[in-house]
Amino acid sequence: MTARLRPELAGLPVYVPGKNVPGSIKLASNETVYGPLPSVHAAIERAVAIVNRYPDNACVDLKAALAMHLGSDVAPEQIAVGSGSVTLCQQLVQITSAAGDEVMMGWRSFECYLPIVQVAGAIAVKVPLREHTYDLDAMLAAITDRTRLIFVCNPNNPTSTVVDPDALVRFVDAVPADILIAIDEAYVEYIRDGLLPNSLELALSRSNVVVLRTFSKAYGLAGLRVGYAIGHPELITALDKVVMPFAVTNVAQAAAIASLEASGELMARTDALVAERTRVSTTLRDAGFELPPSQANFLWLPLGSRTEDFVQEAANARLVVRPFASEGVRVTIGAPAENDALLQFACDWIARTER
């Protein structure tokens, strides 16, 4: 007889990350191609010397550095730190939603939302996207007396789009004050074209808004797992009640602090990536691909039924991309040479398949 497990696990898939095939170009996981800056590397080396000690569970120094980085309006008690922003997503579900409660998100969106909600015994309410973008009006109409938490993934993963900043403010104002809104900004550093929302002001001026960010993308610390949340102090205290103790290591905290100190250099890297994003997007559109305007470090190719063929042929060309069955392909913007290889394959593929 096997151990009795929770029924919520039935049908729950195991998370499958982007593949890493030796010898191939990996454009599947939205990682930065850049390694740590020398100053960050040095901070990591120093922190390695104390890995025999437990880390600071309160992340005091990191919270202070984040408060300074985010601006004078942000205080350390308005910041929670987690082992990547995905753990903070999980904590938000834990502090808001019990069995039978509803957690809303646009769909398709970040894959981890669904299992986090399902494990909690809550109900995931998936509101279809409109033109590959969160449909805030439809989400507002879908709110019920059981809605406890709303995720707004902005930019949205995997479709790369952002909502209109003014529409986001109107949405926040219209949502009942007892429903928590989580603005998930893992890719916020890549937003351009005047589309950056004033999300921090929303979080600091309202008790039911929290902003999630991460060091995994633009800051290049995906392997160290550091994310953070900004919100009302009572909300932050609630998050701290359900955090896994010592989840953010000494090394991760030191690297994050050093990255904030070098944020100017790191943000220059995002400018270079945005330039590549523009180049790759333009070339793909000129070749005949339809894709929404990206404000992230990846592109969304809504290929529908042709998704599997594109992915398989890309693999044959030693390119690893991220498929979403029958919907499309997410392609990370890589180094220029990697992007050139992608463009050569993709332009050839569409020329052959659309004859």
From Swiss-Prot:
It catalyses: an aromatic L-alpha-amino acid + 2-oxoglutarate = an aromatic oxo-acid + L-glutamate. The keyword Transferase applies. GO terms for biological process: L-histidine biosynthetic process. One of its GO terms (molecular function) is aromatic-amino-acid transaminase activity. It is an enzyme of class 2 (transferase). The gene is pat. It comes from the Bacteria. PANTHER family: HISTIDINOL-PHOSPHATE AMINOTRANSFERASE, HISTIDINOL-PHOSPHATE AMINOTRANSFERASE 2. InterPro entries: Aminotrans_II_pyridoxalP_BS, Aminotransferase_I/II_large, ArAT, HisP_aminotrans, HistidinolP_aminotransfase, PyrdxlP-dep_Trfase, PyrdxlP-dep_Trfase_major, PyrdxlP-dep_Trfase_small. Keywords: Aminotransferase, Pyridoxal phosphate, Transferase. The keyword rRNA-binding does not apply. Aminotransferase that catalyzes the conversion of aromatic amino acids and 2-oxoglutarate into corresponding aromatic oxo acids and L-glutamate. Belongs to the class-II pyridoxal-phosphate-dependent aminotransferase family. It comes from Mycobacterium avium (strain 104). SUPFAM superfamilies: PLP-dependent transferases. This is Aromatic amino acid aminotransferase. The modification N6-(pyridoxal phosphate)lysine is found at K217. Its EC number is 2.6.1.57. Homodimer. Signal peptide: none annotated. Its cofactor is pyridoxal 5'-phosphate.
